[in-house]
A protein has these predicted regions:
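AMP-forming adenylation/ATP pyrophosphatase catalytic core
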Residues: 126-134, 138-362
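ATP-dependent adenylation/nucleotidyltransferase module used to activate substrates
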Residues: 1-157, 168, 177-178, 184
Length: 362
């Protein structure tokens, strides 16, 4: 087993570099690669907000050289633009709030990596994600990382049995402090490098600028509506808003007002008090079950509706052809269409899907 070939996805950061180090130490025949997804330098994105800049590529190449394996850069900018940036833009134009990191994992970090792995004769691929894969009988299960503060299982819910059989997450049983210590002891150039932050193709969090540049259109103003449907102001375009938002509404109010819903068909934004943000159910479209099979309904488990949010107990019911309805034991605040709902049984990831506005979207 020690001579098996692994394609290691390297970002130039400490996590993927340590993943490569651990695999090399275990005797695997590693091949390093970086996916060039976006011209960070041309967009003026500062260091520390990137994952595939020229400096990142140099760091990854330096690590590969030190560990003694070849390194390649794959140009996937067109694929990234089509499958991540354009989907991101389309979501905001339709009044939902996407998670582009999940699309990047789905369409780039796994689909394209497996294609390249096959070309290079690699049996496995590996990444620096903090998550674990275990075998349970005839099935593979995806589990949270031991370091729950760094756990990334939420963005991996779309993995299939076929992919889990060929993926390795060497950092799943380590803490972040362990990774930095391993990198420092190995003399890796990025042992103290800061983690990348925010969405890699959005400088300074200015989503509207990216959307306008991509579409060539200016956002269209429309009405702010109260919970009764009365016009109470004018918004700057629905791309500027997400459920739960308070800042930037620029409207007079006697109290704290938040975005409650976005109605793209009417180009309207519904606003109301904080209490209007709470609900105990949501619909989830295109539900993916990692085991390949849906459980018997109703099903008890827990779910999280945002990345950095603890999961909450709920009951799962079928909805539509491929969706589910989640009914939480207690109301949750600002469940947001376009985000992912990911289901857990303890530390095991059951699967997930995209939060829909209504049952008809399932």
């Amino acid at each position: 087993m020690g001579t098996e070939k692994v394609l290691v996805a390297m970002s130039g950061g400490v996590d993927s570099s340590v993943a490569a180090k651990l695999l090399t130490d275990a005797g695997y025949d590693c091949v390093g690669c970086m996916m060039k997804l976006y011209d960070n330098e041309d967009a003026g994105i500062p260091k520390g907000h990137t994952c595939c800049s020229l400096d990142d590529a140099e760091d990854a190449r330096s690590v590969a050289r030190r560990l003694g394996f070849p390194f390649y850069v794959f140009n996937l900018k067109d694929k990234f633009a089509a499958c991540v940036i354009d989907r991101f833009v389309d979501a905001y134009e339709h009044g939902v709030t996407p998670n582009p990191c999940i699309d990047c994992n789905r369409y780039l970090k796994f689909d394209k990596l497996f294609e390249r792995a096959d070309i290079l004769g690699c049996r496995y691929i590996a990444t620096g994600h903090y998550a674990r894969v275990e075998r349970a009988g005839e099935k593979y299960v995806l589990k949270k990382a031991l370091d729950e503060t760094k756990d990334q299982s939420y963005v991996l819910y779309d993995l299939t049995q076929e992919k889990l059989a060929r993926v390795k997450f060497p950092l799943g049983s380590f803490h972040k402090t362990d990774a930095r210590e391993i990198a420092a002891e190995a003399g890796l150039c990025n042992a103290r490098k800061h983690d990348s932050q925010d969405i890699c193709f959005v400088p300074d969090g200015d989503y509207a600028k990216i959307i306008a540049a991509r579409t060539g259109k200016e956002p269209q103003p429309g009405p702010f509506l109260d919970l009764s449907g009365n016009v109470v102001g004018t918004h700057r375009g629905i791309i500027h808003y997400t459920v739960g938002q308070r800042r930037g509404l620029r409207m007079p109010s006697d109290g704290k007002i938040y975005v409650v819903r976005i109605l793209p068909e009417q180009n309207a934004v519904v606003v109301g008090p904080d209490s209007a943000l709470y609900t105990n159910e949501c619909f989830v479209a295109n539900m993916h079950w990692i085991s390949g099979e849906a459980p018997a309904f109703p099903y008890r488990c827990s779910a999280k509706t945002r990345y950095r949010q603890p999961e909450r107990p709920c009951t799962v019911y079928p909805a539509g052809q491929t969706g589910v309805r989640l009914v939480f034991d207690e109301p949750l605040r600002a469940i947001t269409p376009g985000q992912s709902a990911v289901l857990y049984d303890g530390d095991t990831v059951l699967g997930g899907g995209i939060i829909a506005r209504e049952a008809a979207e399932c």
